[in-house]
């Protein structure tokens, strides 16, 4: 038996269940872990999960924009490390924390734009272009930091910067507020602006998009620039939380971001996907990591479990396609 709305949309059909598979998986995961661990479903732990998820979730938003255009960005983890180190060094010399944040965001957006130019204007495959950028940015980070952590210090200015990572406005961690704002902004952009429509159109059919008069290169560059901007924002949050920037920070983060996008139902072929799905995908990874930790599962087995979950998500998506 199905339920039908005024608009005629049917619920609890096979098609509807396939659309909501990510949300259903998240709810099932929460139910299972809550049953196995009494410490899981508590306010403090939920805030802890959201705070830990925020970095990956914010990066995943940028990754979603790029993947929707039929691209991919493997450099976001290295970009996070570099921009985080730049922000930490600026704060460390007692320049205003807000200037450090602005500089890191501008650098991230600029590097993302350069990547976009290489992909769009240079006609280099996104995988190759971003792989090269990943190695380049990691090397630059090592040179910039001399392979050592960069501390923000213990001044009032450092405390202001730290607010972005450990502040709790109205009792809610600052990273959670930032994550919510980023997702709302991305949702509005994708569904209520011309840029959002162009991003979907470009991923759906690049040739047709170009023939319709849309500047496809410009859209790609904007998507990669936004991806870089959000990676740097994630880097700011991570450095603010730890009070230092590690030269190896962000290693493997690009894979977690891609996993969140895939778990959320966005097609790696581009043109299809929802930003809400990406949020759900990031939450699935966050709840899964936290639940396995509470259950005392070894980190080695955790990688296997995550791999199986992601593989199942891809198989389900392929079946849907």
Give each language-model segment a name:
Residues 1-31, 184, 204, 211-218, ...:
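Cytosolic-side transmembrane-helix boundaries in multi-pass membrane proteins
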Residues 1-60, 94-99, 172, 214:
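Membrane-interfacial amphipathic/re-entrant helices at transmembrane-helix boundaries
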Residues 22-35, 63-64, 134-140, 178-189, ...:
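Hydrophobic core segments of alpha-helical transmembrane domains in multi-pass membrane transport
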Residues 31-93, 117-124, 265-275, 308, ...:
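Single transmembrane alpha-helix segments in multi-pass membrane proteins
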Residues 95-134, 280-281:
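Alpha-helical transmembrane segments within multi-pass membrane transporters and channels
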Residues 126-193, 219-222, 241-250:
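Transmembrane helix-bundle core of multi-pass membrane transporters
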Residues 184-225:
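Membrane-helix/interface signature in polytopic inner-membrane proteins
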Residues 225, 231, 241-307:
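Transmembrane alpha-helical segments in multi-pass inner-membrane proteins
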């Amino acid at each position: 038996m199905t339920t039908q709305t005024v608009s005629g949309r049917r619920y609890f059909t096979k098609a509807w269940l396939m659309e909501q598979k990510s949300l259903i998986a998240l709810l099932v995961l929460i139910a299972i872990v809550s049953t196995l661990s009494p410490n899981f479903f508590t306010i403090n732990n939920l805030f802890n999960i959201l705070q830990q998820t925020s970095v990956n979730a914010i990066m995943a938003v940028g990754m979603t924009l790029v993947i929707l255009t039929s691209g991919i960005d493997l450099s976001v983890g290295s970009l996070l490390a570099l921009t985080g180190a730049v922000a930490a060094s600026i704060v460390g010399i007692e320049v205003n924390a807000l200037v450090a944040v602005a500089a890191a965001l501008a650098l991230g957006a600029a590097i993302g734009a350069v990547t976009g130019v290489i992909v769009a204007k240079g006609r280099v495959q996104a995988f190759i272009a971003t792989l090269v950028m990943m190695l380049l940015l990691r090397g630059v980070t090592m040179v910039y930091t001399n392979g050592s952590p960069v501390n923000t210090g213990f001044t009032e200015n450092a405390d202001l910067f730290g607010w972005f990572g450990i502040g709790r406005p109205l009792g809610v961690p600052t990273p959670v507020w930032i994550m919510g704002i980023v997702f709302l902004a991305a949702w509005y952009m994708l569904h209520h602006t011309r840029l959002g429509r162009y991003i979907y159109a470009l991923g759906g059919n690049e040739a047709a998009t170009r023939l319709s008069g849309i500047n496809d290169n410009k859209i790609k560059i904007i998507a990669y620039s936004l991806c870089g901007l959000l990676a740097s924002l994630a880097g700011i949050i991570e450095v603010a939380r730890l009070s230092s920037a590690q030269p190896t920070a962000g290693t493997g983060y690009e894979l977690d971001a891609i996993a969140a996008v895939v778990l959320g139902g966005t097609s790696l072929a581009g043109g299809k996907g929802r930003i809400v799905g990406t949020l759900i995908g990031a939450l699935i990874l966050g709840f899964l990591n936290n639940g396995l930790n509470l259950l005392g599962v070894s980190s080695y087995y955790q990688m296997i479990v995550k791999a199986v979950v992601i593989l199942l998500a891809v198989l389900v998506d392929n079946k849907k396609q």
